[in-house]
Amino acid sequence: MLRHVLCAIACAATLAAPPAAAAEPAPLPLFDAHLHYNWEPVPHFTLEQVLALFRAQNVTGILATSRPNDGTRALYEAKPKDLWVVPFIRPYRVRPDIQTWMSDPQTEELIATEFKRGYYQGIGEFHLSGRAAEAPQVKKTVDFAVRHDLYLHAHADDEALEILFRHNPKAKIVWAHTGFFTAPEQVAAYLERYPALWCELSYRGGITAGGRLTDEWRRLFERYPDRFLLGSDTWVNERWDSYGRTMAEYRGWLAQLPRTVAEQIAWRNAERLFRR
């Protein structure tokens, strides 16, 4: 399916391309801060296919994770000229690890072994709900991240998020999905309370209504323009098939914000956080 999507994009561009003098400016560059290039289960898309898709969508950078970490390594080690890859260690080998990583004695070794490669900038995405975040293995993971100046990419509910910061107040957390449906006023409270918290917006509900930014989220973005990131969350192949639509939806509401705010959320925040 992805191959057909890419072919359609290429054909449409060829047939509809205006003369060079009348060419429209490139769409706003985007950094995808929630990208999974999973190699389990198969099938998976080729490296060439996904790189072509990023290029077609003017996605110029990604926060890359995978299950297992082979996919992330493939993206990073390819060193594509037109894509900045920020690799994170995922504490999963197979999908069932989502439920058990926080109690699996092999998690610590998995993280430490991957970290020795020398290029990872964070750990995650990992899943936590409620008091499961109190597990000793979770605290070890948080402390490892702080000790090595790594970010944590946490798919966590409100309670688990607070526990992560209690484990170590020096933690730097990218909050996957921004709680899904956590009220905007509570999101604002967390941003005030935790200066090293950044909110990633894949699957986040309530941002728009009828294609228009809601007042609550407009205020939040304009008040904290340096604290938000975009993401696709390509956790299943269907998310790859709808990748272009996801990016178009982001650009749709970003266009309703002041240009400086839109650019911060689109890519400048990632540049500030992750560029080495």
Model-based region annotation:
Residues 2-4, 23-31, 41-43, 48-66, ...:
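Mid-to-C-terminal alpha-helical segments outside catalytic/metal-binding sites
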Residues 5-17:
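Bacterial N-terminal signal peptides
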Residues 17-23:
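Signal peptide processing junction and immediate N-terminal pro/mature segment
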Residues 24, 70-151, 198, 203-206:
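Active-site gating/metal-coordination segments in enzymes
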Residues 29-33, 60-66, 86-90, 121-125, ...:
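Structural recognition of the beta-strand scaffold that forms the well-ordered cores
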Residues 34, 54, 123, 145, ...:
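Conserved, mostly hydrophobic/aromatic
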Residues 38-45, 62-73, 94-104, 129-135, ...:
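Acidic-and-aromatic substrate-binding clefts and catalytic sites of carbohydrate-active enzymes
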Residues 85, 132-230:
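Catalytic pocket-lining loop regions of alpha/beta-barrel enzymes
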